[in-house]
């Protein structure tokens, strides 16, 4: 891959990364960062698997950020990996999504290291932002303190 293409992709996805970081998500960009985080994690973690696709931009990211802002019950941790960009980090995080096929965008709520709620692309695409947000809020309400 050419350096110009890689630079272009970095510039293209930066606003997509920033949208989640501004909402309080911590980016995990390497498999080592994922491993280190998961090794010491306790409580609940909301994981957002980011993507460049339209349903991530128009539905998933707005639903996730609004759910985090609006929810009275919040996860202890908010983290994100970027499918297609930070491939090793995404692959490492997906190892914790036992029983769930790779999907991007997607969201997982973990209690400790176990997935207790998963929202695959199929539950995002062709749904309203409000429906996706309600799905997230219901999971926060059920599993978060």
UniProtKB/Swiss-Prot annotation:
Domain of life: Bacteria
InterPro entries associated with the record: BrxB/BrxA
One Pfam family recorded for the sequence: Disulph_isomer
BP terms from Gene Ontology: cell redox homeostasis
Family, per entry: Belongs to the bacilliredoxin family.
The protein's name: Bacilliredoxin GK1781
Biological source species: Geobacillus kaustophilus (strain HTA426)
Lineage start: Bacteria, Bacillati, Bacillota, Bacilli, Bacillales
